[in-house]
Amino acid sequence: MRWLPAFALILSAPAAAAQLLFAGGQWVALDRGGTCEAASRSLRIAQKGKVQARAGFAFDANGARHGQFFAEMSRVPRAGSTVILTVGTQPFMLATTGHWAWSRDPQQEVAIIAAVRAASGMRVDSRDASGRRIIDRYLLDGAPTAIDAAAARCASAKLAKSRRNT
């Protein structure tokens, strides 16, 4: 039953058939065709009609993304507000648009993944338009395996594609 919260993430995924690669702890790894994801939902379950906060790492079979961190926040941050991902005690400033925040560059992505491997939890913090604090918390149990599964699947897809083209 520990995988049930992670499985709920699959059910909320778009109907574009995602193949489950791994489900463990609070995380899943999904193959969505050209994109693979390691993802989780926040600890707080959204009320009906509200946005369910979720976060994860995206990998592309074409190599464009190698573990880009992304987060869909529970509320829209105030315009110009800083969004901080804190993994364990290590902070990372994220780029944002609307409900979404993501890593700024490949070096930051490597640092975030390394921090995830050593921590038990992370949170995404900001302020909304009325100045209220937004805190979306995540457990990292299962995250390293989900990240590895997503990365490996997209790497193998990229390798298979390059072999077909030669």
Name each model feature, range by range:
Residues A17-T166:
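A generic "folded-domain core" signal
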Residues L4-S12:
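Bacterial N-terminal signal peptides
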